[in-house]
Structure formats: structure tokens, C-alpha cells
């Protein structure tokens, strides 16, 4: 397994919508394994394929150490391919989020408290998952990446521009 390079804002790839995967193959699984290793290396809760430069609708998530819900031992890591949010609660919960593609920034984001998704798993099997609390937030954050949306897109344009200027300076090692 390889550690993949992280794409950071303002890279334009992060603003593009990712493409559906036709089938989960051995090659797809190897890529997901590399994504997982990269996510652990970055100490992240989740990772979308676009964050490593691949515009495919693939997510990996592992929050087992922070999930308040008791789950089966083999529940994590989650490999989520072609996710579709098929239901979401009307109740919104606001929380502070960070993102490895938006380094050194934290943003308050309001998201539905619970969601239901359908997706393909690691073995190309159709699955449905109801998630709430922290897992719902992580899935929605990563799902936004697949749609070309970053957490800073929830900010006002003025605040977003300030963050983007900071990120450009950081990228150019001016900070």
C-alpha cells in the first residue's frame, strides 16, 4: 500500500464533480487500500478520492475511536463507492470541521443530524446505511468533496476569500 499525495485548496480539482465508478474491481480495491493508508497517515476521519487527485466517487471513513454508537467490530473502516444520500433529517446540527485539503482551517458547518445513504461496498455489493451524529457529519463532509464542494464554501464570500488567500500563501510557503 502507498501513501498518496494530498490535493489542497485552491486546486481546481477540488471544485469538480467526481464521476461514478462502473464496478468495484481489484484495481479499485487497491486504490481504496491506498486511500485508507493515506487517511491514517494524515490522521483524518475520512478521505474522498478527489483529495488524492482522482475524480471518482469513492470515500473511505474510519471513526471507530470517536463513534458514540456501539457498532460491530468489523464495521470500520467504511469503503463507500458511488454514494447517494436518499434521506436526511430536517434537524440541523452545527459543529466545527477541519479538512486535510484545507490545512490549518476550522469552519462551523450546519448539517443534517442524520442521513441514509446507498452505496457500493468494498466487494461491489449494494448497501444502505443510516448514520447520525459524528458518522453522518463525516459522510456528508466527504460527500461534499464528490460534489466539488469544500467546507469553506459554507462561509460568506468575504470569509472564504480570506481563507483562500491564507491557503495560497501557505502553498507558496510565505506563511
From Swiss-Prot:
Its EC number is 3.5.1.88. Binds 1 Fe(2+) ion. Fe cation binds at residues 99, 141, 145. GO terms for molecular function: metal ion binding; peptide deformylase activity. It holds the Pfam family Pep_deformylase. The keyword Protein biosynthesis applies. The keyword RNA-binding does not apply. The active site is at 142. One of its GO terms (biological process) is translation. Keywords: Hydrolase, Iron, Metal-binding, Protein biosynthesis. Removes the formyl group from the N-terminal Met of newly synthesized proteins. Requires at least a dipeptide for an efficient rate of reaction. N-terminal L-methionine is a prerequisite for activity but the enzyme has broad specificity at other positions. NCBIfam families: pept_deformyl (TIGR00079), PRK00150.1-3 (NF001159). This is Peptide deformylase. It comes from Rickettsia canadensis (strain McKiel).
Amino acid at each position: 500500500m502507498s501513501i498518496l499525495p494530498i490535493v489542497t485548496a485552491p486546486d481546481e480539482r477540488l471544485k469538480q464533480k467526481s464521476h461514478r465508478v462502473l464496478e468495484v474491481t481489484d484495481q479499485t480495491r487497491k486504490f481504496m487500500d491506498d486511500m485508507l493508508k493515506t487517511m491514517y497517515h494524515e490522521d483524518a476521519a475520512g478521505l474522498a478520492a478527489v483529495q488524492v487527485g482522482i475524480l471518482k466517487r469513492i470515500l473511505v471513513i474510519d471513526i471507530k475511536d470517536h463513534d458514540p454508537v456501539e457498532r460491530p467490530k468489523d464495521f470500520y473502516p467504511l469503503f463507500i463507492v458511488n454514494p447517494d444520500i436518499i434521506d436526511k433529517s430536517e434537524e440541523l446540527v452545527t459543529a466545527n470541521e477541519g479538512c486535510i485539503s484545507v490545512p490549518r482551517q476550522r469552519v462551523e458547518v450546519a448539517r443534517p443530524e442524520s442521513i441514509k445513504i446507498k452505496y457500493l461496498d468494498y466487494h461491489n455489493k449494494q448497501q444502505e446505511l443510516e448514520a447520525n451524529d459524528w458518522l453522518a457529519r463525516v459522510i456528508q463532509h466527504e460527500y461534499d468533496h464528490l460534489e466539488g464542494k469544500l467546507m469553506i464554501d459554507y462561509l460568506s464570500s468575504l470569509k472564504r476569500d480570506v481563507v483562500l488567500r491564507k491557503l495560497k500563501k501557505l502553498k507558496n510557503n510565505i506563511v
